[in-house]
Amino acid sequence: MNKIVLLGRLIKDPELRHTENGEKAYTKFIIAVERSFKSADGARKCDLIPITIWGKKAEVICKYMQKGSCITLSGRLRTGNYEDKDGNKKYIAEVIAEDFKFIGNRKEQNEVVEG
């Protein structure tokens, strides 16, 4: 089973994109997920997790979310690799989100939206 559930905040505004043929909408964004423990200096650290979401759900996220918006999402982990322009092999990991829920944004703090 490949299932991930995350709670975090967007680090910048999401942008709606479309596949090359224009048929499918998607967005990619990064959320900061706070770790459950503090570092030696007492500070809380965050992990930056790349997220991709497709279709109508991507449109909803781009319409209602912005930098700082809090989101809970579930999906699956996808890994892959590619060669950069210098021929070095790079490895990637991202979450392909399937469902999400967020509460409010900077404009409407009490609105609940689910996808």
What are the language-model segments listed below?
Residues 1-3, 15-24, 38-44, 63, ...:
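Acidic, gly/ser/pro-rich intrinsically disordered tails
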Residues 3-7, 25-34, 47:
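A short glycine-rich, His/Asp/Glu-containing loop-to-beta-strand
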Residues 54-90:
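Beta-rich strand-turn-strand
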Residues 11, 17, 54, 78-80, ...:
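Conserved positions in beta-strands of structured domains
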Residues 43-53, 60:
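The conserved catalytic core of RNA pseudouridine synthases
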Residues 5-10, 31, 67-78, 100:
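OB-fold and OB-like beta-barrel modules that bind single-stranded nucleic acids
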